[in-house]
Amino acid sequence: NDSLAWAGDSLGAAVDTIGPPLDLDYGYKGFMWGTPLGAIPNLQYMSKPVFIRDSTALEMSGYLGQEAVVIEYVFSDSGFWKVEIKYALDPSDYESHLELFTQVERSLSEVYGFPQTTDRIESGAMGVHDVVNIGFERAFYFSSWNVSPVKISLLLNSIVQVPKNDLNVFGDDMSIMNLVYYNPDYMIMAEEIIVEEPPPSIFDIY
């Protein structure tokens, strides 16, 4: 059971989400790189976009296959430059985090080939961290692809409390898994020009 696959599609969500590799030359799912802020993207199976981050990004939520996600379209002074897909994770299921990363990475690799870079760091719950014997299982997974002019990065930062229970000391937001497509050609922010006023004359001070 591939939880990332659309019904009737043998590839995973990455394939169904991004389309053919050459699409990235133009934009993301038909939304062109450099499109100015104010244009509204439209993705199937997603909610209506809403502005966030002081209106410099659009956010929508929905499902990719069976996975709940939030998708952000982010704009710079040069226009649309990044899509960030944030996966919903079970805060107490460490193994499901690793499995989901592997599934998405596999789907991306079917489209773009093996990752250009990979990084894997895991740490089991060692020792006693406080008086109630709480520890943490941790994993940092990262893979990236270079699909010129676009960069693709997949990141998992998993931190799960052990022993598992319904009450997490640090809440349910310690783990994240994000998939990012970005075009460095549009990562441009206009520099604010600061006009410095000359210091007051010594005669004005004294």
Over which residues does each language-model region extend?
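Non-cytosolic coordination micro-motifs
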Residues: 3-54, 90-206
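Mid-chain, structured segments of secreted extracytoplasmic proteins
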Residues: 55-102
